[in-house]
Amino acid sequence: MKNFMDENFLLQTETAQKLYHEHAAKMPIIDYHCHLIPQMVADDYKFKSLTEIWLGGDHYKWRAMRTNGVDERYCTGKDTTDWEKFEKWAETVPYTFRNPLYHWTHLELKTAFGIDKILSPKTAREIYDECNEKLAQPEYSARGMMRRYHVEVVCTTDDPIDSLEYHIQTRESGFEIKMLPTWRPDKAMAVEVPADFRAYVEKLSAVSGVTISNFDDMIAALRKRHDFFAEQGCRLSDHGIEEFYAEDYTDAEIKAIFNKVYGGAELTKEEILKFKSAMLVIFGEMDWEKGWTQQFHYGAIRNNNTKMFKLLGPDTGFDSIGEFTTAKAMSKFLDRLNVNGKLTKTILYNLNPCANEVIATMLGNFQDGSIAGKIQFGSGWWFLDQKDGMEKQMNALSVLGLLSRFVGMLTDSRSFLSYPRHEYFRRTLCNLVGRDVENGEIPVSEMDRVNQMIEDISYNNAKNFFKF
């Protein structure tokens, strides 16, 4: 029987162990997609308690706690103390066997705080106090955590109207770790609620200095902000979409749709889809002009619980995997850009694992030889960001594409304690490849190439792909 979470955690063969310890573990972290709050990095934020850094905003843990019968006040309530919230999490942890939260929890305790104890009601107070003592030390600040995990680059997620003042402040402070913005223009195509769209466009006008009275004006304002993001080091865009949009439309139609929604009138479903289709193409062309990588996270059904959405707002643990038939639209969208010679580097992230092979085969349709792995299958996202999901994603990519050109892992997290997910991924990767070597499916004579592949997927591919 193996010990829990020892140095060979998840590494089931000798080859896997060598691959991880001698090659994957030493590589720095490039976290090219996350949701860290830039101000916390700029201010080198000092965390007040383990609850704040660990439970604050963590909807993964909140979902588990609710499922375990914990009252909402201990998840998001304002009338409970940090200790009371942590105590309820500690009571939940023993019920999370086989859930990735159990592994993440103990990996984070071990790598961040040097704690090997199992979190339970019996150990909760001891662990809480020990972690809080360490969090009071300078090396456990926001920047300290990034240094601790050998982070080299982080890319935050930012709206076109964001000032990026904290990115600028961080860079000018001389902080050695790069914090770069990512262009996330979802609100610029969110035309479902006319009043919200108009309010956003008015903010865009104010920030860009462009008077907006028609569609062309809005695009001019967005281009100006796109240029500003590029000046601040942006290399990627990101789009959170339910499904891909690829309706047929004319320029005249899109201009008329803008006038209608900007004037306060509700759009038909067809008009909404046409507008989103046009905007995705325009954003794709902008990214191509600058050599950026466009990312698409698709397939989530968000805010399912109306009661809790009204109470807590979005991103609080009430989203789930959707079931959308989107392969044809995805193909049509990518083809539109490709036909015009404006398909930039692209990463596709699915939330429904049923689409793994759909994406893995879609990649090959649009690889053009200009760069290795130009169209990428993104690492297991959200509900798939765990051992089983990672293995399925990498297996599909291996069978139908080139695993060796994969740009690897990202945290997609709001937490400064999420960097061990890179270790979790690397261990899973090494175990997967190591097993093939041990089974005689990869020749031992090619170990130098295998070793290089592990280092590339862990770090080198991302560094070269994004030109950091």
UniProtKB/Swiss-Prot annotation:
UniProt xrefs under Gene3D superfamilies: Metal-dependent hydrolases, uronate isomerase, domain 2, chain A
Reactions listed under catalytic activity: D-glucuronate = D-fructuronate; aldehydo-D-galacturonate = keto-D-tagaturonate
Domain of life (superkingdom): Bacteria
Keyword line: Isomerase
GO molecular function per UniProt: glucuronate isomerase activity
Top EC class of this enzyme: isomerase
Pathway: Carbohydrate metabolism; pentose and glucuronate interconversion
TM regions (residue ranges): none
Its EC number(s): 5.3.1.12
A Pfam match: UxaC
GO biological process, one term: D-galacturonate catabolic process
Family: Belongs to the metallo-dependent hydrolases superfamily. Uronate isomerase family.
PANTHER family, alphabetized: URONATE ISOMERASE
The protein's name in its UniProt record: Uronate isomerase
Source organism (scientific name): Bacteroides thetaiotaomicron (strain ATCC 29148 / DSM 2079 / JCM 5827 / CCUG 10774 / NCTC 10582 / VPI-5482 / E50)
Gene behind this protein: uxaC
